[in-house]
Amino acid sequence: MSIEVLGISGSPIENSNTDRLIRAMLEATERESEFVKLSRITVRPCFACKRCIPDNVCKVRDDFPELAEKIKEARALIIGAYTPYKQIDGFTKALLERFWSLRHVNNLLRGKLCATVLTYLTPDAADHVNQSLATELEQMERMELVGQLMVKGNLTCLTCGVGDECEMSGIKRRYGPEARSCDVPYSRVEDQQEVWEKAMRIGRLIGQRLRTMDRN
């Protein structure tokens, strides 16, 4: 069966909050879906070679052309990212750059449904990244953005093994001079009730919209 909803995660952490929420949203759509983790494949940044202009096919030799076929086939995308250094992660940034190859003349993403998941530590930075995502997907790719989710993530220093001793650790800076990694609870997306419920609503909405399109 063809892919109707494609979930793409830019989180490199195995079974991360981002991954689990995307998978749950895919299930909530009740449509044929597939999950892709960008850290398991190779999608390099755009080389600005412009060789994609005549046929909307990227000529960079990595895994994007194969992924692009799935993206073109899908009727809806759920894109997950996170915000290291208060910016969008490199995996997702490279993917968004490569969307450029699909835009020329034919605008192959136009009209597709889309939702985003963003895992963050700093709310202000996340707001800025969310705004940038909305601008690219709606205004540049002409997709229909049906929802955006923000998930509270976890400080990397909590699980690196040296976070309590490292001079550069963010634990004390963020949680106080006496804080230790064992004092900070792990943030699970399943425990963020409002976020989880909103995600399920968005997933169901995508499924409903696709069913409505089928009837028309």
Predicted segments, located by residue:
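Glycine-rich phosphate/pyrophosphate-binding loop and the adjoining helix
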Residues: E144-N216
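Helix-loop-strand module that forms the ligand-binding subsite of alpha/beta enzymes
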Residues: K59-E144
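A generic structural motif
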Residues: T29-E34, R142-E144
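N-terminal beta-loop-helix "entrance" segment that forms/cooperates
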Residues: L38-C58, T156-D164
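Residue-level recognition of beta-strand->loop/alpha-helix junctions
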Residues: S9, K37, L149-M150
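Short Fe-S-cluster ligation motifs
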Residues: S9-S11, T18-L21, A76-F91, P185-L205
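Iron-sulfur (Fe-S) cluster-binding segments and ferredoxin-like electron-carrier domains
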Residues: I53-E69, E165-R174
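N-terminal beta1-alpha1 ligand-phosphate binding loop
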Residues: S2-R31
